[in-house]
């Protein structure tokens, strides 16, 4: 009834994105809900964005596509048949998470270097530190998107704390019966 995909799509890659989403769509119940979290970059507009993408492709996620802007991701979800119910752009929060990862990375420097060497330690140190900066300045982000499979199978205001006093499951009392 529910599926959660946490940053899996980046590793699927652009060439397999549509197939991945079709498979997820087929697995989800008709009244199901999916939380789809995906990292992405804004559309490239400065030189740093190109350098970042090349670095990521060579050293961090070879063959993965963590560089898709939000409009592309939403389009893919909609073409797969999903209805987007909500979207949160959480890059600034994600940068705080990555900051903690970097602190853990540095705290375990000796262990990492002993097991993987100086080069890998430095590459990932650069990656984590740069990820914090690029997320804080808006160049990259993480998108948390809630989608449904069937527009009519779920109440559209469920999950909204207050929507003008409307209740997700209407009281089926006299008023409800008189309207229908």
Language-model features: where?
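A conserved beta-strand element that flanks and buttresses the S-adenosyl-L-methionine
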Residues: 4-9
